[in-house]
Amino acid sequence: MKQLLDFIPLVVFFAAYKLYDIYIASGALIAATALSLAVTWMMYRKIEKMTLVTFAMVVVFGSLTLVFHNDLFIKWKVTIIYALFAVALLVSQFVMKQTLIQKMLGKELTLPQSVWGKLNFAWAMFFLVCGLVNIYIAFWLPQSVWVNFKVFGLTGVTLLFTLICGVYIYRHLPGDQEKPEEEKSEQP
């Protein structure tokens, strides 16, 4: 349910863009994100830090887009959010010596420290690459291409990357693992 609440503002943004324009869509994104945040608070009495950072960026860059009537601000939002996430992940790993990924998922999963480090670094690189691709699409391709990329491209690639990370995590979960056939046949 929580992921659905996080996804609704994106759907509202896309619909408003298709029906009206980028400026109505930016205002709708601000309103939908605020509403999503309020509903999340009412349902769970907790809001994740990443959600608060995203909300703040939506308000700041969405408002700048509306005030200056310039879509560059809303286009930069994606890259700046992803850059902040990447920096936070890298600082947690290399400065704080505890990965954010482990801090978020460590209560549910038991993984070797090296796996946590690889996952954390992989997500940091993922966010950096997505931010760079966003810059290219936002500034070199038509606005409609950027909107489709923001809504469908980034969502799709994030789901795919999450699935790949899930497979990677599954491979490293502790538990009874089958021995290779040669080892089984050698046992008395």
Curated annotation (Swiss-Prot):
Membrane-spanning residues: 22-42, 50-70, 72-92, 121-141, 149-169
GO cellular component terms, semicolon-separated: plasma membrane
Subcellular location per the Swiss-Prot or TrEMBL entry: Cell inner membrane
First-listed, main subcellular location of the protein, grouped into a coarse class: membrane
Matching InterPro entries: YciB
Superkingdom classification of source: Bacteria
Membrane topology: Multi-pass membrane protein
UniProt keyword list: Cell inner membrane, Cell membrane, Membrane, Transmembrane, Transmembrane helix
Pfam families (alphabetical): IspA
Function field: Plays a role in cell envelope biogenesis, maintenance of cell envelope integrity and membrane homeostasis.
Annotated family: Belongs to the YciB family.
Protein's name according to its UniProt entry: Inner membrane-spanning protein YciB
Organism: Pectobacterium carotovorum subsp. carotovorum (strain PC1)
